[in-house]
Curated annotation (Swiss-Prot):
Pfam families: Ribosomal_L9_C, Ribosomal_L9_N. HAMAP family: Ribosomal_bL9. Keywords: Ribonucleoprotein, Ribosomal protein, RNA-binding, rRNA-binding. This is Large ribosomal subunit protein bL9. InterPro entries: Ribosomal_bL9 (IPR000244), Ribosomal_bL9/RNase_H1_N (IPR009027), Ribosomal_bL9_bac/chp (IPR020594), Ribosomal_bL9_C (IPR020069), Ribosomal_bL9_C_sf (IPR036791), Ribosomal_bL9_N (IPR020070), Ribosomal_bL9_N_sf (IPR036935). It comes from Endomicrobium trichonymphae.
Amino acid sequence: MKVILKSDIANVGRQGEIKEVSAGFARNYLIPQSLVMEANDLNLKIWKRERGILEKHREEIINSAREIAFKMEASKFTAKVKIGENGKIFGSITTATLVKIFEDNGFKVNKRDIILSDNIKEIGDHEISVRFHPEVVAKIKLSVINEKE
């Protein structure tokens, strides 16, 4: 079944694209969730009219995501933590902790957008990736220091 994507869908395509999907997937999931519309003559005419607006809107979103990513990459983030005798920190720095650090510096980030392979458990400089858009990922530097310093 041919469908027009109303939003970006992982492993299917991006908003505004016309894709071929299985009829069951379309009828049982995509259409009830309002993620797609069937690609019939009427919907194709509507889609062609709105396509330019969608592209312009997508570019605005990507540009604003790039702006925020650039500002965050230029900023310095520091986490002050308690340290044990062996040089390791008590507990760990999680995505929730990072969200708080970013908010304290004026940036609103969803914890699901923070790409962290494992919680941070050591002092030093760490690089963290934050996904603002599927096409925009920022590499942010975080310094973990002793809270007594």
